């Protein structure tokens, strides 16, 4: 795909405590490489990737294929950058909420991140995937899978255990989030009867949408 040759521009935001592996996770997803020497993100950074999203009919048959330009925003986890980070929440259509499986504290702080999301995201119930990263460090693990799945069930969101080092579930977790977003947008399109192809500059927003309201469902 050339520049501008896409149907949707989707902005995803990775957030979580500093050091949970957001930067290496996104690098693995976009470049399929692992770089353990990334320095801590200062403020905001982002990576990009073009994908093709295939829809399915009600009977399970193949539907239309959409070309999607993903912008994956990488946020600083440190407290001093928190006000800058939350300023980007309203522009994101989906969130990769990440904690470190080798850090119980980063898992406990997921609740704080959820509170900030609910207060600052484009709506009160945005599309979120919970990610327990560094699954390859088995001997250092502090958070068990049951704990994490129970928390994800409480919030009604998918949960994945990932590893930027091995690539485990990295692509699958992002694809799951994209699927949630595209299905939500499809419902909006059906209700408002707007064209099914949205120019990238609109970021997938539907004509007539009221930005001031924080209702997610159309």
From Swiss-Prot:
Residue(s) carrying Cysteine methyl ester: 218
GO BP term, pick one: positive regulation of exocytosis
Keywords: Acetylation, Disulfide bond, Endosome, GTP-binding, Hydrolase, Lipoprotein, Membrane, Methylation, Nucleotide-binding, Prenylation
Residues binding GTP: 16-24, 74-78, 133-136, 163-165
Membrane topology reported for the UniProt record: Lipid-anchor
Motif Effector region boundaries: 38-46
Gene3D superfamilies, per the entry: P-loop containing nucleotide triphosphate hydrolases
A single MF term (Gene Ontology): GDP binding
InterPro entries tied to this protein: P-loop_NTPase, Rab27a/b, Small_GTP-bd, Small_GTPase, Small_GTPase_Rab
Residues with the N-acetylthreonine modification: 2
Covalently lipidated residues, kind S-geranylgeranyl cysteine: 216, 218
CDD domains, per the entry: Rab27A
Family as reported in the entry's similarity comment: Belongs to the small GTPase superfamily. Rab family.
Protein name: Ras-related protein Rab-27B
Organism listed in the record: Rattus norvegicus (Rat)
């Amino acid at each position: 795909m050339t520049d501008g040759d896409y149907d949707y521009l989707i902005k995803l935001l990775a957030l979580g405590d500093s050091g949970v592996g957001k930067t290496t996770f996104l690098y693995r997803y976009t470049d399929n490489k692992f770089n353990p020497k990334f320095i801590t993100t200062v403020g905001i950074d982002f990576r990009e990737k073009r994908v093709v999203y295939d829809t399915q009919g009600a009977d399970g048959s193949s539907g239309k294929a959409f070309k999607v330009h993903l912008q994956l925003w990488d946020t600083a986890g440190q407290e001093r950058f928190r006000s800058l980070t939350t300023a980007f929440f309203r522009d994101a259509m989906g969130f990769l909420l990440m904690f470190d499986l080798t850090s119980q504290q980063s898992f406990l702080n997921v609740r704080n991140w959820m509170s900030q999301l609910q207060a600052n995201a484009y709506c009160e119930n945005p599309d979120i995937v919970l990610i327990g990263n560094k699954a390859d460090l088995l001997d250092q693990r502090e958070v068990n899978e049951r704990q994490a799945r129970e928390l994800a069930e409480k919030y009604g969101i998918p949960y994945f255990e990932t590893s930027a080092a091995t690539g485990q579930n990295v692509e699958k977790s992002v694809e799951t989030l994209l699927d949630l977003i595209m299905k939500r947008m499809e419902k909006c399109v059906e209700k408002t009867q707007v064209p099914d192809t949205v120019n990238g500059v609109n970021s997938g927003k539907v004509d007539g949408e009221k930005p001031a309201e924080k209702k997610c469902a159309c």
